[in-house]
From Swiss-Prot:
Protein name (record): Sodium/hydrogen exchanger 3
Transmembrane segments annotated in the record for this chain: 23-43, 52-72, 110-130, 139-159, 175-195, 220-240, 266-286, 306-326, 346-366, 384-406, 417-437
Record topological domains on the Cytoplasmic side: 1-22, 73-76, 98-109, 160-174, 241-265, 327-345, 407-416
Pfam families found in the cross-reference section: Na_H_Exchanger
Family from the record: Belongs to the monovalent cation:proton antiporter 1 (CPA1) transporter (TC 2.A.36) family.
């Protein structure tokens, strides 16, 4: 009896210790998120930095500190899970992308976007897969199967164009922004559909019948996922329109929109469809129909709530990727063969550059043949910008790599460990190095005139104080004349007159 009671007390103490560790981890992570937001805002106007790179660097620095404190045992305060990423973090990002998209530009360039996002991703997938198979077999990095090589193609075909989109201006370059933005979403969806199809099929003996079945399954998922997203968006519009006749409730409207959007994502997961495509088109349909059936207060609330959720999810992902990159367990397996890991990373970066160029320039040429107006054509500078925008790799690549090459985030197999560490290296290098060069490159290729910059500033200020679509001010216009939009906010000014900045 005494032994049983002692065992129970030990288990209770261990449980409390575990709960306390979780609370400490969450406190630290929330504090880091706040730091990322503040520093990202302060560094927003710099020539090189953006919020994604800021979060990645803060995550890496935090990982180093934790690694030193733990005596080299761990650099993590949370365990990475691809389920956490795909079920909780990705939905708000993709839904907000569809909800905030400028539909006129998106559908005007829909065929070009699908050309880049679907056909282009397939071309990149083929080049990376066969290039990796041909080169990695010579390096003898481990027993990778044909399914692994095809998965590598899908993993590194998934782009992350956040850095470029933060630099581009929707009002100054609507065509370019629409193409980069639309292609990024369709690209992620295509990569995930390809990855899921690879895992579903037995690809040990590929023949024409399996290839046709694979292609048929791919287009089946694409079409059905889009249809489900459209249906979910229309259902939300119908429910909100019929449910609150004469008695609109902002709380219920916002809650219903959020839940129905998330339901569309989970239904796609339930039926093994592309949840990314589903929730993206659900967001587009909701912004076109559902949004106009709610009150003005609900319009303002949903617009900013969805944007804030998406923003937090993006920062969370980059922060964790930076922290997880220094996890000692992943690098321990490959420490005896660092040259192989560096070689694999270099080859993957080269294949990414080649795979991207192999479709951007030829498909741009084909797209230009169908355009009559010079404004609708993609000139060489725009093509280079589109090519560059897709060179960064992010959390989608990380999550897919974990899914393919690890079990519960861990692996002791050399080939799998090399692929995980190489994925981390490619994500870090492309996000930081390519990301740092993005601002000056885009500014050089797409210079904004002084007049257009002034116009964009005026548009931003008008939309900040009064949204013409909503017919409702977002901020109070009292004392508007005292507000100087070009005034630089610094810590020195904050300490001199804190009331001016806090009230």
């Amino acid at each position: 009896m005494v032994i049983g009671l002692s065992t129970m007390l030990e288990k209770t103490e261990a449980l409390f210790a575990s709960d306390h560790a979780s609370v400490v981890s969450m406190n630290l992570f929330v504090a880091l998120l706040c730091a990322c937001i503040v520093l990202g805002h302060l560094l927003e106007e710099t020539r090189w930095m953006n919020e994604s790179i800021t979060a990645l660097i803060i995550g890496s620095c935090t990982g180093i500190v934790i690694l030193l404190i733990s005596g080299g045992k761990s650099s993590r305060i949370l365990v990475f899970s691809e389920d956490l990423f795909f079920i909780y973090l990705l939905p708000p990002i993709i839904f907000n992308a569809g909800f905030q998209v400028k539909k006129k530009q998106f559908f005007r360039n829909f065929m070009t976007i699908m050309l880049f996002g679907a056909i282009g991703t397939l071309i990149s997938f083929v080049i990376i897969s066969f290039g990796a198979k041909h080169l990695f077999e010579k390096m003898n990095i481990g027993d990778l199967t044909i399914a692994d090589y095809l998965a590598i193609g899908a993993i590194f075909s998934a782009t992350d164009s956040v850095c470029t989109l933060q630099v581009l201006n929707q009002d100054e370059t609507p065509l370019l922004y629409s193409l980069v933005f639309g292609e990024g979403v369709v690209n992620d969806a295509t990569s995930v559909v390809l990855f899921n199809a690879i895992q579903r099929f037995d690809l040990t003996n590929i023949n024409s019948a399996i290839a046709l079945e694979f292609a048929g399954n791919f287009f089946y998922l694409f079409i059905l996922s889009t249809a489900l997203g459209v249906a979910a968006g229309l259902l939300s519009a119908f429910v909100i329109k019929k449910l609150y006749i004469g008695r609109h409730s902002t709380d219920r409207e916002v809650a219903l929109m959020m839940l129905l959007a998330y339901l569309s994502y989970m239904l796609a997961e339930l039926f093994h469809l592309s949840s990314i495509l589903t929730v993206f088109f659900c967001g587009i349909v909701m912004s076109h129909y559902t949004w106009h059936n709610v009150t003005d207060k609900s319009k303002v609330t949903t617009k900013h709530t969805f944007a804030a959720m998406s923003f937090l999810a993006e920062i969370f992902i980059f922060l964790y990727v930076g922290m997880d990159a220094l996890d000692i367990e992943k690098w321990d397996v490959v420490r005896n063969s660092p040259g192989q890991s560096i070689g694999v990373s270099s080859i993957l970066l080269g294949l990414i550059l080649l795979g991207r160029a192999a479709f951007v320039f030829p498909l741009s040429f084909l797209s230009n043949l169908t355009k009559s107006s010079p404004d609708e054509k993609i000139d060489l500078k725009k093509q280079v910008t589109i090519w560059w925008a897709g060179l960064m790799r992010g959390a989608v690549s990380m999550a897919l790599a974990y899914n393919q090459f690890t079990t519960s985030g861990h692996t002791k197999v050399l080939g799998n460990a090399i692929m995980i560490t190489s994925t981390i290296t490619v994500v870090l290098f492309s996000t930081v190095v390519f990301g740092l060069l993005t601002k000056p490159l885009v500014k050089h290729l797409q210079p904004s005139s002084k007049q257009s910059s002034t116009t964009a500033l005026q548009i931003t200020l008008r939309s900040s104080f009064h949204d013409p679509i909503l017919h409702e001010p977002l901020l109070s216009t009292q004392g508007q004349s005292e507000y100087d939009p070009e005034q630089h906010v610094s810590f020195r000014m904050f300490w001199k007159s804190p009331s001016r900045f806090t009230h």
